[in-house]
């Protein structure tokens, strides 16, 4: 298993443990839209989009553009590297424990 796949599994396991809904977007196919983040999540009513990258990975311009558009629309757009996993976990926990109005 590649380091990127192990990291993806770690993130998905954490989201499951937190009771979050998410879907893995399989891009790159003939009938799929390019630039969509890897994980589309709902965390306590908040839209969270996560683009996963390995330690040395780089986001493409279209991925960054999409994340920016999600951010502008009021969602949480995250470009996630392994060294930022703890910060990601804190954000998800904070969103998950936020009181709904």
Where does each model-flagged region fall?
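Catalytic phosphate/metal-binding cores of nucleic-acid and nucleotide-processing enzymes, i.e., regions
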Residues: 1-101
